[in-house]
């Protein structure tokens, strides 16, 4: 299509939302063949632009992620949060794939299948073990015969010990064998290999050990990523796999006000999982200043005072009540039960 033909087509085109035509020089949003004015391409619920252009469509209307969750998404039977994307339906509930796990070994069940066992959802190995316990014996997962003596547990499964040899010395194993990085060792060999290695200098740690960031450290080698001073037992703060002292953590990652987007100087109001300047924390409807002592409800990720909340439609209050109940499970500071308003 030539430039002149395209101009003629756009001259006759109309915005999908307001049905008005487009100015010759204005920017046009094309969403799956539908054309919009830039200011018309907004969430059908909160009328705000879609963050990073991400939206969810339901019955011909487009919603931002937050409003789609609040209006339509099912709630996970484990974590209580909204499920977006793949939903696992099992045990008369909805689940995130990562939340539907064996109740004994915690392995994900979404792609493995599960077995109901006494009202629990279990993976097949755990189900088999529970069934064997009912018989009073373990079942060897290699030869599938009953284990009369103490079993050797390897990767959470029981075995006859004489099925295995030590990965280091080659001796036949007994039930007191130990697993290390997927290999089995007799107890003497394992004890020789169990010395922790420092995450900084990569040398063995023979004295006190600091466990942090998923590694082990010499006390003097566990330091602030900025000033490199040892913490020596003092509090540290973690960010993207690095540890910082309090001073440099605040300098590098200070709280930013959700309302004005400025770094907060002075007191910080922590509410609704966000940080606010004291002067910016107010009712999003009537602009009345709020404190954490006031009763308020979260709506569109902002606080709404008690007086404005009471004017909301009944159906909206029901949705907010459900959202409040889910939030209270996470023990968020100053969350308000809408039943008390």
Curated annotation (Swiss-Prot):
MF terms in GO: metal ion binding
Subcellular location: Cell junction, Focal adhesion; Cell membrane
SMART domains in UniProt: LIM
Residues modified as Phosphoserine: 328
Gene Ontology biological process: cell-cell adhesion; cell-cell junction organization; cholangiocyte proliferation; integrin-mediated signaling pathway; negative regulation of apoptotic process; negative regulation of cholangiocyte proliferation; negative regulation of hepatocyte proliferation; negative regulation of neural precursor cell proliferation
Domain annotation LIM zinc-binding: ranges: 13-74, 76-133, 138-195, 196-255, 256-315
GO cellular component entries: focal adhesion; plasma membrane
Membrane topology listed for this record: Peripheral membrane protein
Annotated SUPFAM superfamilies: Glucocorticoid receptor-like (DNA-binding domain)
Main location (coarse class): other
Tissue: Detected in heart, lung, kidney, liver, urinary bladder, fat, skin, skeletal muscle, uterus, large intestine and testis.
InterPro entries to which the protein is assigned, alphabetical: LIMS1/2-like_LIM1, PINCH-1-4-like, PINCH-1/2-like, Znf_LIM
PROSITE patterns: LIM_DOMAIN_1, LIM_DOMAIN_2
Quaternary structure (record): Interacts with integrin-linked protein kinase 1 (ILK) via the first LIM domain, and in competition with LIMS1. Part of the heterotrimeric IPP complex composed of integrin-linked kinase (ILK), LIMS1 or LIMS2, and PARVA. Interacts with TGFB1I1.
Protein name: LIM and senescent cell antigen-like-containing domain protein 2
Source organism phylogeny: Eukaryota, Metazoa, Chordata, Craniata, Vertebrata
């Amino acid at each position: 299509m030539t430039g002149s033909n395209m101009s003629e087509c756009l001259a006759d085109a109309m915005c999908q939302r307001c049905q008005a035509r487009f100015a010759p020089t204005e920017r046009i949003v094309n969403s799956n063949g539908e054309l919009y004015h830039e200011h018309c391409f907004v969430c059908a619920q909160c009328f705000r632009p879609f963050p990073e252009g991400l939206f969810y469509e339901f019955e011909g209307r487009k919603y931002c992620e937050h409003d789609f969750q609040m209006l339509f998404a099912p709630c996970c039977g484990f974590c209580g949060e909204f499920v977006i994307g793949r939903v696992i339906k099992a045990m008369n509930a909805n689940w995130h794939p990562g939340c539907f796990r064996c109740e004994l070994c915690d392995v994900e069940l979404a792609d493995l299948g599960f077995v109901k066992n006494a009202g629990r959802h279990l993976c097949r190995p755990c189900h088999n073990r529970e069934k064997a316990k009912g018989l009073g014996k373990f079942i060897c997962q290699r030869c599938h015969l009953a284990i009369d003596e103490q079993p050797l547990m390897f990767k959470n499964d029981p075995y006859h010990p004489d099925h295995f040899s030590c990965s280091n010395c080659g001796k036949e194993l007994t039930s007191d064998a130990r697993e290390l990085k997927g290999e089995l060792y007799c107890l003497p060999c394992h004890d020789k290999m169990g010395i922790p290695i420092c995450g900084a200098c990569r040398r063995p740690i023979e004295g006190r050990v600091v466990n942090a960031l998923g590694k082990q450290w010499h006390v003097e080698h566990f330091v602030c990523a900025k000033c490199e001073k040892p913490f020596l037992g003092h509090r540290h703060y973690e960010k993207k796999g690095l540890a910082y002292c309090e001073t440099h953590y605040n300098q590098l990652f200070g709280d930013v006000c959700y309302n004005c987007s400025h770094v907060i100087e002075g007191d910080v109001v922590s509410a609704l999982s966000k940080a606010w300047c004291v002067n910016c924390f107010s009712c999003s409807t009537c602009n009345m200043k709020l404190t954490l002592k006031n009763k308020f409800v979260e709506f569109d990720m902002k606080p709404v005072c008690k007086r404005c909340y009471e004017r909301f439609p009944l159906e909206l209050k029901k949705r907010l009540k459900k959202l409040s109940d889910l939030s209270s499970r996470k023990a968020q500071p100053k969350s308000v039960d809408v039943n008390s308003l």
